[in-house]
Curated annotation (Swiss-Prot):
Group of enzyme by EC: ligase
Protein name: Serine--tRNA ligase
Gene name per UniProt: serS
Coiled-coil blocks: none
Keyword line: Aminoacyl-tRNA synthetase, ATP-binding, Cytoplasm, Ligase, Nucleotide-binding, Protein biosynthesis
Organism whose genome encodes this protein: Psychrobacter sp. (strain PRwf-1)
GO molecular function per UniProt: ATP binding; serine-tRNA ligase activity
PROSITE patterns hit by this protein: AA_TRNA_LIGASE_II
Amino acid sequence: MIDPKLLRQDLTELKQKLAKRGYELDVDFWQQMESQRKSLQVITEDLQAKRNAGAKQVGVLKKNGEDATELLAEMQNISSEMKQAEESLKALQDKINQAALQIPNIPADDVPEGSSEEDNVEVRKWGTPRQFDFKVQEHSDLGEVLGQLDFAAAAKLTGSRFSVLKGQLAQLHRALIQFMLNTHTVKYGYTECYVPYIVNSDSLEGTGQLPKFEEDLFKLTNHTNNEAMGFYLIPTAEVPMTNLVRGERLDASELPLKFTAHTPCFRSEAGSHGRDTRGLIRQHQFEKVEMVNIATAAQSDELLEQMTGQAEYILQQLQLPYRVVKLCTGDMGFSALRTYDIEVWVPSQDTYREISSCSNCGDFQARRMGTRVKEGKKTELVHTLNGSGLAVGRTLLAIMENHQNADGSITIPEVLRPYMGGAEIISA
């Protein structure tokens, strides 16, 4: 949530900043809300003052042995009016808060302006895409010929946008998870977490998925009456890990907190009809190793650079060419103020595809969660950061395609061989 003070001050400037990311701020609505809030606040404070003054008068009358019946009746009316005014003020404040939850984060000043991924800015590249001397196969074909990637079985079990891995590909998938977690914990000092895959609505509101993006989530219902239970499958481990500090007051000496976890992620892909329908690019269920940092305001910018570099290191060790792009204002996620995407080279598509997104959310999520840090006498909101380190399925497909051989076998990257009993090749 953005700072509520901004909605009471220069709305024109705020409108301009939010317009950069394609959000139209309703200035008239917010001016009306603030006018009503001030009016109800004045009424409530006036009634409070009258009640306090009346209470003193009653005390004086009783002390002097005088009749206070009439004044007590008047005070009862004031109390009734005050209760109504307070209820009206609370209802209005709830309406204001709900409306504020729909407003995205304000982009940082250095974020390039733009409306789509076409306006993202390339920051750097690593590695050179391999020149093949045979016809490149896409990962779905490679996996099916190997007999180790089965979309038909997944469709029978569940439906479209699911997959079944078998044999060495399933082992490679597991090896990637172990390698990623070991890298983040041993090399970079993250604390590994095991978290619930089901969260409540407060958690999703804290990180910004609710209330605006409910259609992207899988919501649990009671099978006996089909009523919502208030629980959702996680779309990313960012949600439970960031919410570990919801409502907490931390000490500056504790920060940064660095969490990592491997979880399945569940997404409805509501807006992706017809896109990437084949293969592992876009699934309803996929695995991801996530990184979350909880930091002070002074730490967060540098931590974003570090986190992005940590995700890059994984790709470098796997010998996968990639590029880093800074997302433009119109392509950033709802909660982010600055985001780097890492895109891995996919030979069959002759292009780079997103494999990691690393974001600094500033105090946007912290304000929603009520998470603060105390440094000396000063208490302020923490900053939160999150990043994929990495999306496992997309890393798997990148290995399959970039390290494929003419006979349809796949060369296992050296760093993964210890996790696969020393095997060097995946073959039928």
